């Protein structure tokens, strides 16, 4: 009986909504990779300035498979946010795979894959976010990721 439950849960997990965003960024893959993995660089672009209370963005990374990361900030309205997860795959300057869960809803864990490919003098970045809780979560994350990638592009270029 447990295996049936597990199978049903696994089937549901793989059929959840996902999103894929591709961007060409005018910076080398190594620079983009560092922007995702170095906490000092991460806080330079992660977050939309108009929505963040200045000086509240913090990031921690333990960059190894099984290592954890955490990003926290306070919004201008005073609400606190924290997202984090575990690194599942790391290929320097090429690929990062990590779990993604807001600490307010840890049961809604999903997975993010960042792929970086050289493209002339720049990088083709592909962000694939899968196993999202529902369509509303997918749509909200699509909006958020697009805003964040705008910030990353400005930071790295």
Region spans (language model):
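A conserved amphipathic terminal alpha-helix motif
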Residues: 1-4, 14, 130-157
